[in-house]
Design a protein with these regions (language model features):
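Bacterial N-terminal signal peptides that target proteins for export
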Residues: 1-10
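A generic, residue-level signal for flexible/boundary positions that often mark functional hotspots
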Residues: 12, 76-78, 114, 126, ...
């Protein structure tokens, strides 16, 4: 008889899958990426990802609360560190209907540009996506990485269950949000992709991660730092969400 050792990550995934049995409330959880000592990516002009993601998230929260009648919960509403496991726990504790994580992209190549939207998968769409997920998952030494290649049968079973539970809804939400980003921002459309982002694991509802633009690209950094562009990003995500809800996904 095989005996499984249940680690913290496995417990988190199992709890999320059990929480999925409960009916979803009219709550949307917005996750402003990074925060506190974990600044995220930094642009040439000194702008920090953590500040941009919070600004966009606050604008999105206001739009949803004003026009949709949903309760909106932020994983952070100020400049503080929030462990990745705690972010997904916020969604599950509030029985969230949707989870949206907001980020600003970064790359070694300063010419890299555009917007893209992700949903969870054990396997990354391509090598660039795998690299991005690795960097996000290892953004601080205080947080551990979920290693899909680990020889742990229980973790693999839970990973499969977690990624399949809401994959159709997450894929559709990502598609609609990305379509609105493309229509409103004028940035390169990098499409929708799948990646093993740790922040999306263990969330017991449809979940996406939005990379609004590249803060490592000086031109896009200036856009990301502007109130006008931040508002457009929030409005694009809002419109994609509205289309998703209207379709009764």
């Amino acid at each position: 008889m095989k005996i499984f050792r249940i680690g913290a990550a496995a417990v988190l995934l199992l709890a999320a899958l059990l929480a999925a049995q409960a009916p979803a409330e009219r709550t949307v959880v917005i996750d402003p990426g990074h925060g506190g000592l974990e600044t995220g990516a930094k642009g040439r002009f000194g702008n920090l990802e953590k500040d941009i993601t919070l600004a966009i998230s606050l604008k999105l929260k206001a739009l949803i609360e004003k026009d949709m009648g949903f309760e909106v919960v932020l994983t952070r509403d100020r400049d503080v560190d929030v462990p990745m496991e705690a972010r997904s726990a916020v969604a599950n504790n509030h029985k969230a209907a949707l989870f949206i994580s907001i980020h600003a992209n970064g790359a070694v190549q300063k010419k890299a540009a555009g917007s893209e939207t992700f949903f969870l998968s054990l396997n990354a769409t391509d090598e660039e996506t795998r690299r991005l997920a690795y960097l996000e998952n290892n953004s601080t030494e205080l947080q551990t990485r979920v290693d899909p290649s680990a020889d742990n049968d229980l973790m693999m079973i839970l990973w499969d269950m977690a990624q399949n539970a809401y994959i159709k809804q997450s894929s559709r939400l990502a598609e609609l949000v990305q379509g609105e980003l493309d229509a409103m921002l004028g940035t390169r459309n990098r499409g929708i992709k799948q990646a093993p982002f740790k922040v999306l694991t263990g969330v017991a509802c449809p979940a996406i991660l939005v990379e609004a633009a590249f803060i490592s690209n000086p031109d896009e950094e200036q856009k990301l730092a502007s109130d006008t562009f931040q508002t457009k990003v929030a409005e694009a995500i809002y419109r994609g969400l509205a289309r998703y809800l209207k379709a009764g996904q």
